[in-house]
């Protein structure tokens, strides 16, 4: 007979750390916190670092960041390094086999070789970007632990699909076969109950094999809760956005506890151009990451498949053409002056000059991106 924890205890429903998870962590489970540089994972890491210290949990606490390459927002890695240093939490950076853009390119080439006329971009129904670029590298890393909890910053408020997620469940891809959640467990409640039973089974076996959980500690948090844990508020973020839009970039960004992309107007921070992003965030991402926009828009033009169904990045070419070179340079100078972005080391620049052809280096200037934007505009098919 498996021991049952207080799954339906009302006080437990309101707590970020349920009685079951508390028990697991008190028994020495290592805690790996998945971070992206976004506000939710920032808040989760801040909260859990405090909980880990105050509860004297004996397992290791660490942060995991899966770097997706040049599609990341400028300064994400710098931000996470500062945050983890501030919280005294070790940060492990993981890298997928291919960066996100390289994965799209490979899939496009594979479909061409097979003469299959299919979209190659990831989408809501084909989220291989999450599976291949984040989950698989994380699982590979986590297999070094025999008893581990991986915390992920999903919130129910974000979507109906996320609202249906369990607070915790067995991490099937790395847990030993005896503890994997059966396919018959469909609901969040069933998956949570199974996790509790599987944990007791693991204890009864003398801790045989690997026991691993996925946990959503801020599942019930509101946006207000997230900003508050990060040391700011919805009102302060709105004030900073107004300053940024008025051109007062330094005052807008200075002392902001999260990544500057929120101050620039983004509502979420994922990839700088995300297939699941809103129209607003796509436009803002393109304006602030014109190099990435140019590369992806050219992939659209040459492949014939739009980045999002019915929405082309190439259609934003007029907006990207209007990007002010002065504003882009000012932004980078501000980020560097506030120590939010490291300047490339001179030795790195010299090495780049030695190994890269001049024509490749020229691509990464803002002037060349504007020229490419003009070309993309000309290549767009005329509306019928």
Name the predicted role of every residue range.
Residues 1-34, 39-384:
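Nucleotide-activated chemistry modules centered on ATP-dependent adenylation/adenylyltransferase
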């Amino acid at each position: 007979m498996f021991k049952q924890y207080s799954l339906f205890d009302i006080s437990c429903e309101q707590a970020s750390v349920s009685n079951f998870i508390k028990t697991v962590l008190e028994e020495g489970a290592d805690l790996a916190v998945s971070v992206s540089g976004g506000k939710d994972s920032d808040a989760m890491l801040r909260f859990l670092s405090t909980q880990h210290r105050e509860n004297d949990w004996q397992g290791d606490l660490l942060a995991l960041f899966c770097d997706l390459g040049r599609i990341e927002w400028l300064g994400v890695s710098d931000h996470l390094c500062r945050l983890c240093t501030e919280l005294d939490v070790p940060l492990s950076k993981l890298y997928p086999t291919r960066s996100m853009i390289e994965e799209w390119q490979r899939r496009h080439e594979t479909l061409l070789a097979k003469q299959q006329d299919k979209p190659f971009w990831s989408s809501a129904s084909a989220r291989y970007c999450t599976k291949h670029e984040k989950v698989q590298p994380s699982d590979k890393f986590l297999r070094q632990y025999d008893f581990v909890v991986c915390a992920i910053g999903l919130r129910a408020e974000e979507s109906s699909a996320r609202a249906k997620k369990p607070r915790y469940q067995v991490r099937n891809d790395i847990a030993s076969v005896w503890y994997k959640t059966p396919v018959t467990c469909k609901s969040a409640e069933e998956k949570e109950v199974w996790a509790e039973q599987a944990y007791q089974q693991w204890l009864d076996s003398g801790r045989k094999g690997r026991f691993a959980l996925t946990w959503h500690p801020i599942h019930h948090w509101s946006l207000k809760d997230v900003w508050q844990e990060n040391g700011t508020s919805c009102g302060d973020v709105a004030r900073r956005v107004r300053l940024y839009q008025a051109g007062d970039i330094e005052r807008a960004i200075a002392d902001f506890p999260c990544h500057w992309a929120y101050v620039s107007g983004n509502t979420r921070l994922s990839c700088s151009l995300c297939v699941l992003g809103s129209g607003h965030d796509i436009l803002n991402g393109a304006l602030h990451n014109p190099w990435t926009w140019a590369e992806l828009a050219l992939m659209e033009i040459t492949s014939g498949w739009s980045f999002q169904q019915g929405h082309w990045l190439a259609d934003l070419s007029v907006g990207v053409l209007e990007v002010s070179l002065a504003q882009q340079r000012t932004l980078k100078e501000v980020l560097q002056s506030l120590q939010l972005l490291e300047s490339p080391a001179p030795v790195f620049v010299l090495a780049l000059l030695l190994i890269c052809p001049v024509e490749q280096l020229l691509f990464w200037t803002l002037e060349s991106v504007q020229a490419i934007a003009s070309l993309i505009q000309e290549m767009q098919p005329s509306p019928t």
